[in-house]
UniProtKB/Swiss-Prot annotation:
It comes from the Eukaryota. Belongs to the OST-beta family. Keywords: Cell membrane, Glycoprotein, Membrane, Signal, Transmembrane, Transmembrane helix, Transport. GO terms for cellular component: membrane; plasma membrane; protein-containing complex. The chain crosses the membrane at residues 65-85. It is a single-pass type I membrane protein. This is Organic solute transporter subunit beta. Expressed in liver. Essential component of the Ost-alpha/Ost-beta complex, a heterodimer that acts as the intestinal basolateral transporter responsible for bile acid export from enterocytes into portal blood. Efficiently transports the major species of bile acids. May modulate slc51a glycosylation, membrane trafficking and stability activities. Able to transport taurocholate, estrone sulfate, digoxin, and prostaglandin E(2), but not p-aminohippurate or S-dinitrophenyl glutathione. Residues 1-20 form the signal peptide. InterPro entries: OST-beta_subunit (IPR052678), OSTbeta (IPR029387). It comes from Leucoraja erinaceus (Little skate).
Length: 182
């Protein structure tokens, strides 16, 4: 950064040295006419020399630079979109690898839970207790079985949940039908 500051400071000093006197100060006004005429001649000479310098270094048409910067902007925009596309593709493949790896982990976890359940079943001494635990699990009944075993009053509407209670009765989980009024 200090190199950039040195460069800018050098350019500033160079501009100050090359700048010609273009305005009259109060000191030149108070001088006699003879010295003013001499200074005017010197100033016109300086103007002629700066004009000669300007002619030796003519100003270029800035449209070339404008087109170059415009082309550079399009190249940078293209590169930015290219990097964005590569980044999204890399993220997608990383997610797919993570999902495939997680699927393998889930299979091993399922195997370990099955082994733990088998050990638990082996540890249970009383078979009657095991049978009682298995019977207390909720059972799921399809709608066809419910329609065959129960009266026509129990047919469910859309969105209603049928439950078989421990006493053997089949009924709806929610008896409140506030949505029917709407």
């Amino acid at each position: 950064m200090s190199g950039l500051l040195k460069y800018l400071f050098g350019c500033f000093i160079l501009c100050l040295l090359l700048q010609g006197k273009t305005h009259m100060t109060s000191a030149t006004i108070s001088k006699p006419h003879e010295t003013i005429d001499i200074e005017k001649q010197n100033m016109t000479g300086e103007r002629n020399s700066t004009l000669a310098q300007q002619l030796s270094f003519p100003m270029e048409d800035p449209t070339n630079w404008n087109y170059a910067i415009l082309a550079l902007a399009f190249v940078v925009l293209f590169l930015a979109f290219l990097i964005l596309a590569q980044n999204s593709r890399a993220n997608r493949t990383r997610k797919m690898k993570a999902l495939n790896g997680a699927g393998g982990r889930n299979e091993t976890e399922a195997d370990s839970t099955q082994k733990a359940m088998m050990q638990y079943v082996v540890e249970v001494d009383n078979l009657a207790e095991t049978d009682q635990m298995l019977q207390s699990k909720p059972t799921y009944i399809s709608l066809n079985q419910v329609a065959q075993t129960s009266s026509p009053k129990v047919l469910p509407k859309e969105g209603q949940i049928l439950v078989e209670w421990k006493d053997g009765n089949i009924g709806f989980l929610y008896t409140d039908s506030k949505e029917d009024d709407v």
